[in-house]
């Protein structure tokens, strides 16, 4: 930690004012040394970015300033946050039945605080922000006038020109804004180029003369510019500020005398390059439909003005358009002045409707008109600070903008004063710096009719559109809400006019407001309605929803069933309403529907519809399905249908279907299911948990499998250890070095396979398993009374267990769970192929899941066989490791991992078999066992017990006889 300063010590940084310069000036090296000394005293260091700011402070403001677009975005976020809180408060008062206040404190607006938009050449921004020795730059003007000046964002070329490429905004009190405008114009730079091709003095003598005789407030330098014929021509570049224009003219005339001596100077010896925003080319240069303005300037100034040919601004590439003016020094600067007078200027401000000289009607606030006598364009729209719903004591807010040319700024200020009410006792500024402009009498009368100027002071249309949609929805609900009298509100039918609603408050007569006029908030209490009325609305809603699904809509929107009460759930004789949220204000809350759950609506949005047969099947099937019989996270109980839906044994899962074709799971009977076959058979695969898995990374999802199994992937890299053995207690083997590439079946058997226990939190409602009717077998349902020990899990048992599985076929991994239903019908046990089972009953209780607990299963036949994903890893139980030792598996230190994992399972026992030997033994065996999904797990255990008894009888007979003899004595 650095040194801590005492509280009584004077903190120089705390009292530092960036706009107040010290009496003593320091050069860049001295400032940098002082900064390094101050940093080292506090055990800090000066970064490279800070060094650049200290050495070149003018670059800091230009590169790191708050852009105008950032300010607009901040205002939009502020307004959206405010409006959301306001509407939430109104909804809460309605839900609690409390009276609404007459007004709610809003964002304060001041009509005397305006935003002025002007055009400045972007090529001089770096000079405008620099000090230049006289302490006048953008920062000093901001401090002097108490305004906020924002340079435009760095423009990026696009298909259409950027209207804000050179637009500078000045925000503040209208009197201060005009002072800042004049200071910015006075400190604006310009550059003229002097041709040296016809001079009488040698170039090196001129360069020496310029270095030895500098001119105050004028910068001169030499530049080389190639001509069209390839010859390089040298020019003298002269740069100054507008306020130093007289000094530049005197310097240019003196140079003419020195260079040409007694001979007269050429007439067109000076050139000026003026940059213009391409968006305003038609408004500055003119067009064939209005008038060509550059010939007027040429006649008045006897100059030559040239510019690239154009038809319209959209055909001109780039955001900057260059105009070239050639003539003597006086005429060139005069022509520049006339061109600048044609630059667009606008002023924006927010104002209450009651603060206007003539308040407008709410429905007629979208105004765009031209005042012919003053040449001003007035545009008014609803303000972005106006809430969507106004209370009884609140007034509408307007956003007004006045637009014209820069030479007409005096009339623009006058129009601004006339818009405001007389209660604002002030006099608008009357600048006289454009009184001598030629455009007061030379500009055609119809030139401003096609004038258009976007300005930064107006926020983007996105906010206005959001409020327009919000108010339109509220107005539509108030018009089409369920009312006994069927009354509708009349609104003016204007094209761009904004529909508006007023929220009733306690001061108004609440009896005249319909009960369903306002959107029900998401936390509203239930609304009780007579039972027969609600049943009628349920039928109408179901019919409307069916029609919506026939048209291919993803789900009903709250705005589409305004004619009905809020959606309901019918349960016996009790009827409760599920309120919904406003779709604009509460955009983050999902829409809840009693008949269509939230997860069902998501299914349609995520569902593929690329196949024509798939879409046709959906349109036929969707209207007839009973959504009340589908499980949903939005309802508390699930009532199964009387006719359960038939499903195939091995159905393609939703997540497998959405991934690549190689990852689809193959059925046990060898039939590869595809998308068309599944939908033709009418199967549903829309489950919420699968869509939750879709949000994961696809590669990570296939690494971990459906429930944590690494072998769900069909495209695993052979030479990659995709599982952390220390974390999951998986035993990894290895063998000698590789000499040839593995075959397809070796790739499938390269990895370690595990038969493990499922977790007891897996049930049908949560996992949505696929079921298939299996033949009933009563002869093999009994379980041996003898206990099962650790010797149960052996290689021979696994051979018999997997004898009927075709391991050579990729993607075939049988996973079976036998479903037993007890006689009383109160509970159901699901027993997997590892011998563990779970009980699913009304109490949601789960019994112990060990091998001994299998004895508790009664003599019940198999009713269904269920394909279930792998359960999550449980380290409390042993695992059977099926591993094929080949010469391709000695990769990435498998020997160390194998040694570490030998003691990770139950009782420090791992059972390993060679799958290739297993396949060979199955092929050589003449015994044909039935398919594994047609057998009970008790059959497998009984056969295993017999095999163990046959193998151990010879080794234990002697020991048993000795024990019997000792016990007889």
From Swiss-Prot:
Region (Disordered): 459-508, 602-711, 950-969
UniProt protein name: Defective in germ line development protein 3
Chief site of localization: cytoplasm
Other observations noted: The deletion mutant gld-3 (q730) makes no detectable GLD-3; it is predicted to generate an mRNA with a premature stop codon, which should be subject to NMD. The deletion mutant gld-3 (q741) removes the fbf-binding site from isoform A, but leaves the gld-2-binding site intact. Animals homozygous for gld-3 (7q41) enter meiosis, but are feminized. In addition, gld-3 protein that retains its gld-2-binding region, does not have the dramatic mitosis/meiosis delay seen in gld-3 null mutants. By contrast, sex determination was not normal; gld-3 (q741) males produced oocytes.
Mutagenesis / variant outcome for changing residue 327 to R: Abolishes binding to gls-1
Keyword check for RNA-binding: no
GO cellular component term of the entry, any: perinuclear region of cytoplasm
GO molecular function, one term: protein domain specific binding
Domain of life: Eukaryota
Region span, gls-1-binding: 57-471, 769-969
Lineage of source species: Eukaryota, Metazoa, Ecdysozoa, Nematoda, Chromadorea
Entry-linked CDD domains: KH-I_CeGLD3_rpt1, KH-I_CeGLD3_rpt2, KH-I_CeGLD3_rpt3
Pfam families: KH_GLD-3_1st, KH_GLD-3_2nd, KH_GLD-3_3rd, KH_GLD-3_4th
General function of this protein: Required maternally for germline survival and embryogenesis. Forms a complex with gls-1 which promotes the oogenic cell fate by freeing the translational repressor fbf to repress sperm promoting factors. Promotes maturation of primary spermatocytes to mature sperm. Required during hermaphrodite development to promote sperm fate, which is critical for determining the normal number of sperm. Promotion of sperm fate is at the expense of oogenesis, possibly through the negative regulation of fbf. Required during male development for the continued production of sperm and inhibition of oogenesis.
Biased amino acid composition, Low complexity: 631-644
Biased amino acid composition, Polar residues: 487-508, 664-676, 954-969
Gene: gld-3
Calcium in keyword set: no
InterPro entries listed in its UniProt record: GLD-3-like_KH5, GLD-3_KH2, GLD-3_KH3, GLD3_KH4, KH-I_CeGLD3_3rd
Places the protein is found: Cytoplasm; Cytoplasmic granule; Cytoplasm, Perinuclear region
Location of region: fbf-1-binding: 860-949
Species: Caenorhabditis elegans
One BP annotation, GO: spermatogenesis
Subunit details: Interacts (via its KH1 domain) with gld-2. Isoform A but not isoform B interacts specifically with fbf-1 and fbf-2 in an RNA-independent manner. Isoform A interacts with gls-1 isoform C.
Span list, region gld-2-binding: 34-81
Stretches with biased composition (Basic and acidic residues): 647-659, 677-687, 694-711
Known tissue expression: Expressed in the germline (at protein level). In adult hermaphrodites, first detected in the transition zone (TZ), weakly expressed in the early mitotic region and in pachytene germ cells, and becomes more abundantly expressed as germ cells enter diakinesis (at protein level). Expressed in primary spermatocytes, but not in secondary spermatocytes or adult sperm (at protein level).
Keywords: Cytoplasm, Developmental protein, Meiosis, Repeat
KH domain ranges (all copies): 34-109, 113-187, 189-259, 270-342, 344-419
